[in-house]
């Protein structure tokens, strides 16, 4: 229904940008995008350096970078398909931190980490290939904006939060922490752990919002609902006849 709310030559200005930024209903997904990819980005940046520190040659290091990419693509396609198939976002996205937390914990606290060559490479490869929920979140933002105008802006804002997370990721591993990066891996462990309650909070938040809308909607008569559909000034995801996906 919202596809007719603007034409293809209508510009989006500062007012629309401000409204999208202040749409607190999408803040939980922005927060997810901000922290969800920090772990992968951090280790991905230093993966070749870590492999060389383990004693691999440049040629071997290049070859050993292939398995994480294959695993990453496989998980990306699989988890995105599962989310659409099950029509579920929060719980499916939980697969990512539940997969990553044990791995980064082993990488951080196992005494053989950084010393036992192939075991260390395997752990890093599995961590780098973790389920990637970016595609789920991009679609999630688009659906929960419920407006053609705000959809494009909100998607751009989401990507801005992802990029801010990437900037933070570049500053977690430090020179004084080389080569085992114990401090950095502790931070990554806490970040991955934080994603679990954040996803659960997001699920509960959208269920609560839907329940609040449902109470008001159910109090209306059919005539009142029809009048609301035609004349209400509510826009986007604030409309009572819109249900948040979670």
Question: Which residues fall in each region the model found?
Answer:
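Intracellular terminal tails of multi-pass secondary transporters
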Residues: 1-6, 180-246
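Extracytoplasmic gate region of multi-pass secondary transporters
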Residues: 12-81, 134, 138-139, 168-170
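Transmembrane alpha-helical cores of Major Facilitator Superfamily
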Residues: 34, 66-70, 98, 156-164, ...
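Hydrophobic alpha-helical transmembrane and interfacial-helix anchor sites in secondary transporters
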Residues: 82, 141, 175-176
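Cytoplasmic membrane-interface "Motif A"-like loop-to-helix N-cap segments
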Residues: 84-98
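C-terminal ends and interior cores of transmembrane alpha-helices
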Residues: 95-113, 128
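Hydrophobic core of transmembrane alpha-helices in multi-pass small-molecule transporters
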Residues: 117-136
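A late C-terminal transmembrane helix in Major Facilitator Superfamily
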Residues: 148-180, 187-191
């Amino acid at each position: 229904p919202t596809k007719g709310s603007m034409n293809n030559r209508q510009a989006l200005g500062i007012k629309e940008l401000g409204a999208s930024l202040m749409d607190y209903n999408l803040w939980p997904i922005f927060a997810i995008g901000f922290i969800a990819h920090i772990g992968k980005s951090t280790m991905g940046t230093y993966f070749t350096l870590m492999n060389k520190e383990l004693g691999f040659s440049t040629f071997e290091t290049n070859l050993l970078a292939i398995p994480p990419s294959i695993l990453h693509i496989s998980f990306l396609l699989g988890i995105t398909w599962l989310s659409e198939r099950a029509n579920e976002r929060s719980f499916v996205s939980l697969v990512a931190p539940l997969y990553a937390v044990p791995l980064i914990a082993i990488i951080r606290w196992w005494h053989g980490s950084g010393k036992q060559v192939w075991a260390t490479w395997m752990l890093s490869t599995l961590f780098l290939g973790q389920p990637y929920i970016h595609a789920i979140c991009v679609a999630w933002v688009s659906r929960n904006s419920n407006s053609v105008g705000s959809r494009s802006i909100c998607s751009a804002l989401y990507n801005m939060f992802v990029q801010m997370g990437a900037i933070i990721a570049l500053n977690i591993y430090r020179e004084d922490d080389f080569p085992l990066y114990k401090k950095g891996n502790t931070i990554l462990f806490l970040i991955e752990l934080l994603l679990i309650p954040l996803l659960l909070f997001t699920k509960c938040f959208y269920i609560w919002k839907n329940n609040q809308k449902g109470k008001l909607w159910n109090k209306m008569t059919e005539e009142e609902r029809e009048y609301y559909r035609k004349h209400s000034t509510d826009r986007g995801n604030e409309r009572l006849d819109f249900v948040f996906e979670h």
